[in-house]
């Protein structure tokens, strides 16, 4: 439910909150409503070559994994990350993981290459 708040508002879903969120999800693009049915389908399919997760505006999320449990874990991490962003918003602005720190994660965990 929390994740869909980002799909329906167009607010950026920044998963650079904690290392686990970025490692599991990487940076998540958002595609226009109905992209899985129209001329965006090929572009959408291309995204899954380099990332496991995409959002569809006012629609849903698409997530992949090599096993069902892995796919579910990503969805669960995404929803908890979304919930943490929503709950933290009244406390102040997000202090995301930096690009340098992301590069360290990319190298250490062999993701997003």
Annotate the PLM regions.
Residues 1-113:
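Glycine-rich flexible loops
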